[in-house]
Amino acid sequence: MDGEDVQALVIDNGSGMCKAGFAGDDAPRAVFPSIVGRPRHTGVMVGMGQKDSYVGDEAQSKRGILTLKYPIEHGIVTNWDDMEKIWHHTFYNELRVAPEEHPVLLTEAPLNPKANREKMTQIMFETFNTPAMYVAIQAVLSLYASGRTTGIVMDSGDGVSHTVPIYEGYALPHAILRLDLAGRDLTDYMMKILTERGYSFTTTAEREIVRDIKEKLAYVALDFEAEMQTAASSSSLEKSYELPDGQVITIGNERFRCPEALFQPSFLGMESAGIHETTFNSIMKCDVDIRKDLYGNVVLSGGTTMFPGIADRMNKELTSLAPSTMKIKIVAPPERKYSVWIGGSILASLSTFQQMWISKEEYDESGPSIVHRKCF
């Protein structure tokens, strides 16, 4: 398998969005929702060529008549048939490539079950006949994209958040922490607090509207209590949003109450530590000699870190947890929504990486378990 003459494909399969493209590019060619939609009603118009399932943007645009399902929950694939549909759509409709002609780099969340990664490997080789593949840890790729080899990555996507400390290019597995609280939980929480305002959003299609409200209007308050006071005493924080049917709704303190759950998971009835505390705990699990380097390189990555104000708040919270003399730096690259993909693009085009691929021959010889030996 000679990686020089053929471009590798990089696919970052997120719980919410799938990012796909070619190694060496600076941005993914295709970004679409990781959704498979099936009609809620039976078709009556014969000859319209109705399909029994829709993927990605097409599912999103027809959401009014479909039931939408996400095959990846909390970073783990829960429905392999739908996952196969998403990959098929990625190769043939989005990238328009033959998977049997390109090595494929896939990504996954750290601390995923081993079976998840084996099944990914099996489908790539047996269903799509790829010549070679590799599975990389998402947070590690984000660090590559930021041009660092040491730092702690706080990666928060739609399905899962995790903190991964990396020193001189090595991830420290004993200190990786995972938090099953991410964008989708915030969307559900936003649905709940909007219901308290008298706006009802219940179906899977309406959840997508709420996700849009969250992405466009939500932000993280630097001081939550003070912000609540401001919201109560004036209408300066209120914003309006036009629903697809033209109805206009107003949202106020929901704008910052929603992402506040990242710092106070008790809002969602969860007992876990918030993202700031999880980052701190992760640093504390590392050797005392390297903590300073980690505090000075806290890299945010993933779509759920895109809320305005999140970096300042993270800085404030970590400063109060860390030793008083510690220099803390939060790195929030503007392209952090795609930094996992960008890191994958960098990794797959390195000449030193070419011997890391799992080839079809190796797979045929050892079976799916080879992935644990060849990929971190």
Curated annotation (Swiss-Prot):
This is Putative actin-22. GO terms for molecular function: ATP binding; hydrolase activity; myosin binding; structural constituent of cytoskeleton. PROSITE patterns: ACTINS_1 (PS00406), ACTINS_2 (PS00432), ACTINS_ACT_LIKE (PS01132). It is an enzyme of class 3 (hydrolase). It is found in: Cytoplasm, Cytoskeleton. The gene is act22. Actins are highly conserved proteins that are involved in various types of cell motility and are ubiquitously expressed in all eukaryotic cells. Multiple isoforms are involved in various cellular functions such as cytoskeleton structure, cell mobility, chromosome movement and muscle contraction. The keyword Protein transport does not apply. Its EC number is 3.6.4.-. It catalyses: ATP + H2O = ADP + phosphate + H(+). Pfam families: Actin (PF00022). InterPro entries: Actin, Actin/actin-like_CS, Actin_CS, ATPase_NBD. Keywords: ATP-binding, Cytoplasm, Cytoskeleton, Hydrolase, Nucleotide-binding. SMART domains: ACTIN (SM00268). It comes from Dictyostelium discoideum.
